[in-house]
From Swiss-Prot:
InterPro entries: Kinase-pyrophosphorylase, PPDK_reg
KW Transferase (keyword) present: yes
Catalysed reactions listed for this entry: N(tele)-phospho-L-histidyl/L-threonyl-[pyruvate, phosphate dikinase] + ADP = N(tele)-phospho-L-histidyl/O-phospho-L-threonyl-[pyruvate, phosphate dikinase] + AMP + H(+); N(tele)-phospho-L-histidyl/O-phospho-L-threonyl-[pyruvate, phosphate dikinase] + phosphate + H(+) = N(tele)-phospho-L-histidyl/L-threonyl-[pyruvate, phosphate dikinase] + diphosphate
Name of the protein in its database record: Putative pyruvate, phosphate dikinase regulatory protein
GO MF term set: ADP binding; ATP binding; phosphotransferase activity, phosphate group as acceptor; protein serine/threonine kinase activity
Matching Pfam families: Kinase-PPPase
Binding site for ADP: G153, V154, S155, R156, T157, S158, K159, T160
UniProt keywords, alphabetically: Kinase, Nucleotide-binding, Serine/threonine-protein kinase, Transferase
Length: 279
């Protein structure tokens, strides 16, 4: 493997922001735990002069080259250079565009950065983020009916990060903590429009997460109940009882990442929206 030590060079060349490349590259690189990519990101490469600098740096530090370029002259020159110095290169969007062209029977418009145009979807995400931040952790419960999704759960079931992730997908998300001994907001009992999802985890997992949280905060005492196994088990039972009573969808997040939890909720939400469409 052509690496130096435990790292390799990864060149990401884009005529736009490079976000697509970074996301794809990091997702793949994460599968190789024993080697670390040294990222060289080149955004907004739209001229031959800008490409000159990129090619010089690639030649100085050879490695994998991934790109999202629409200008054919730039693509041809980049690929030729990589072939000349014997390093791999791949267009991330090229195969996808070819598939679209073959199926739709039409070529692309070739609009650089078209995916970042300020459209209705963009403003929907901004609106969702604003809503979610205002309705985090049980705040402003009078506005719960305006949510697309309401997450409930005991402490450390990842309600807030999951809410923010969903908001970034344009889903207006509120979250409300479930605490034994504290009545839930009456607004939560009568919701009609939002999908209510109750996040659950095993007591063992919750205790582990909570202990790590306390350590990070430097709190060593005074929180025995927070991590006591019986107390946490009672919390979980309380949350399950409420979920069954109000017919909330229950989702086990014990072994799920934030992304996996959000993906499961998005599927539930999408399926629910589809069922509500008129025949």
């Amino acid at each position: 493997m052509p690496t130096t030590g435990n790292y390799f060079h990864l060149h990401l060349v884009s005529d736009s922001t490079g976000e697509t490349l970074i996301t794809v590259a990091r997702a793949v690189a994460a599968q190789y735990a024993n080697v670390t990519p040294v990222e060289h990101v080149y955004p907004l490469v739209r001229s031959q002069k800008q490409l000159d600098r990129v090619l010089d740096e690639i030649e100085e530090a050879p490695g994998i080259v991934l790109f999202t370029l629409l200008e054919k002259d730039l693509v041809s020159r980049l690929e030729a250079k990589c072939q000349q110095i014997n390093i791999p290169s791949l267009s991330i969007i090229g195969p996808v565009m070819q598939l679209f062209e073959a199926y739709l029977g039409a070529s692309t418009a070739g609009r650089v950065g078209a995916q970042h145009v300020l459209n209705a979807e963009y403003f929907a995400r901004i609106d969702a983020l604003n809503y979610t931040m205002l309705h985090d952790d049980g705040q402003m419960v009078d506005g719960l009916e305006d949510a697309d999704v309401v997450l409930v759960g005991v402490s450390r079931t990842s309600k807030t990060p999951t809410s923010i992730y969903l908001a970034n997908r344009g889903v207006r998300t509120a979250n409300v903590p479930l605490v034994p001994g504290i009545p839930i907001p009456h607004q939560l009992e009568t919701l009609k429009k939002p999908l209510v999802v109750s996040l659950h985890a095993t007591p063992e997992r919750l205790i582990q997460v909570r202990q790590n949280r306390l350590l990070s905060m430097g709190a060593e005492s005074g929180n025995e109940t927070y991590v006591d196994k019986q107390s946490v088990t009672d919390e979980v039972a309380y949350a399950r009882k409420l979920s069954a009573r109000f017919n909330w969808v229950m989702l086990d997040v014990t072994r799920r990442s934030i992304e996996e939890t959000a993906a499961a909720i998005l599927k539930l939400y999408t399926d629910r929206q589809r069922q509500r469409l008129p025949e």
